[in-house]
């Protein structure tokens, strides 16, 4: 009998099957983690925008519907792939909405509720008011 070196076809098929099973389990988890990370980018930006809205309100006795006014106070520009808008603003209230194209849902921010998740999927159009 010869001294065989290397792997048999069966051994290689078993290794390929194990790799396929691991990929089937891990890939969906990685995609979900990416969506959660994208949502975190949105909530962090909205939290910053809330702080700058409060700063603006202290100086002007009213909230602003102009993102440029918040940027002039120090708010960073909108992150890549994030849609952000100040839907409404008055002396006592504001409504800001944001979502990431690779995220799960739209997020909103108001003085009463702070930053919160809406029930509207990011794949649908942006809400026109804070729910």
UniProtKB/Swiss-Prot annotation:
UniProt GO cellular component terms: cell outer membrane; periplasmic space; plasma membrane; type II protein secretion system complex
Cross-referenced PROSITE patterns: PROKAR_NTER_METHYL (PS00409)
Propeptide: 1-6
Subcellular location: Cell inner membrane; Cell outer membrane; Periplasm
Cystines in this chain: 95-130
InterPro entries xref list: Bac_GSPG_pilin (IPR000983), N_methyl_site (IPR012902), Pilin-like (IPR045584), T4P/T2SS_Core (IPR050470)
Phenotype of gene-disrupted mutants: Deletion mutants show defect in both DNA transformation and twitching motility.
Post-translational modification remark: Found in three forms of 14-kDa, 18-kDa and a glycosylated 23-kDa form. Both narrow and wide pili are glycosylated.
Residues found modified as N-methylphenylalanine: 7
Pfam families in the record: N_methyl
SUPFAM superfamilies: Pili subunits (SSF54523)
Glycoprotein among keywords: yes
GO biological process, one term: protein secretion by the type II secretion system
Domain of life: Bacteria
Induction notes from the record: By growth in minimal medium or low temperature leading to a significant increase in pilA4 transcripts.
TM annotation in the entry: 7-27
Chief subcellular location: membrane
Keywords associated with the record: Cell inner membrane, Cell membrane, Cell outer membrane, Disulfide bond, Glycoprotein, Membrane, Methylation, Periplasm, Transmembrane, Transmembrane helix
Membrane topology according to the record: Single-pass membrane protein
Subunit organization: Interacts with PilQ.
Primary role: Plays an essential role in the assembly of two types of T4P pili: a wide and a narrow that participate in natural transformation and twitching motility. Major component of the wide pilus that is essential for natural transformation working as a DNA translocator structure that spans the inner and outer membranes. In addition, participates in the assembly of the narrow pilus composed of the PilA5 subunit that is required for twitching motility.
Protein name according to UniProt: Type IV wide pilus major component PilA4
């Amino acid at each position: 009998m010869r001294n065989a070196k290397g792997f048999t076809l069966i051994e290689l098929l078993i290794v390929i099957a194990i790799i396929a099973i691991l990929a089937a389990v891990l890939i969906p988890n990685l995609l979900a983690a990416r969506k959660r990370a994208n949502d975190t980018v949105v909530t962090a930006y909205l939290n910053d925008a809330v702080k700058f809205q409060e700063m603006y309100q202290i100086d002007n006795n009213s909230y602003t519907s102009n993102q440029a006014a918040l940027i002039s106070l120090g708010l960073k520009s909108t992150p890549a792939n994030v849609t952000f808008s100040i839907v409404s603003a008055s002396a006592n209230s504001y409504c800001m909405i944001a979502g990431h194209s690779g995220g799960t849902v739209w997020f909103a921010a108001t003085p009463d509720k702070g930053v919160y998740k809406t029930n509207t999927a990011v794949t649908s159009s942006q809400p026109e008011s804070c729910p």
